[in-house]
């Protein structure tokens, strides 16, 4: 625990250095408000995943940056492992203003931003670098800006990584192997249709229900990035892992729009830059440790890692999903 606290301190220091231009906003040094330092605004951050997961790698790099740069006018409280609800609940809470900030996967967010369906399309990206180039550019920003229409504001894309299939029944190398398997997916119409097209029986389910449902045999498997598979202990109940890379699935840092507009220009810049700095660290972490997570799943939990997957067959199986959702998305554009 002591060692981990040093990690966050180092990240905060690095972020502080990167945030140099913000500190001199309008040529004015940051001045502390004694009352604000003694009575900071407490921001609760909830996620569905445990503290060791990539989301919290990002959040616990972002929060100290904001606290430091605002001289303690904001403080953060952490609520991991679905303590504040599922991902849709978290997004709804931020929209309603009962929470100020959260990090949510794209899967449940199409109800708040139809454009997010684009990002959820299967096999859309072939590499993380390709994904970063698109999402960090004008197209990605345009998609994020659509959240403003529903009372949310998106600061940045966070990282999940590529998702893999895991199940309790058998090795999966091709769509034919998925036939009859009940696979949990996020509450995303695109993801439901994609897994069904691949041959599975997709079951949309909020994350708090998943582990028990796997234990009881209500579902046969799930799909998640390797690190999430390890951190959420699905390694214990779904030992067959297929490296399908079927979704590149980012997350979004969301804040309440009305609250965001009430902030000073300086504070908005601090939050924005802190979100982007922590995003970059998350990406580095996942890029460096995803393979390690698979090795732990294989050696410690005796998971069987299937790398010889017929990706071309999976890509072909989901073509109808593209036809359906590209038509829907085009229909929403002026």
Please identify what each model-predicted range represents:
Residues 26-130, 139, 147-334:
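N-terminal secretory/targeting leader peptides
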Residues 134-136:
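Short, Φ-rich (hydrophobic/aromatic) sequence segments
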Residues 1-42:
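Short, low-complexity disordered leader/linker segments with a strong preference
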Residues 143:
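Basic phosphate/pyrophosphate-binding loop/patch that engages nucleotide-derived ligands
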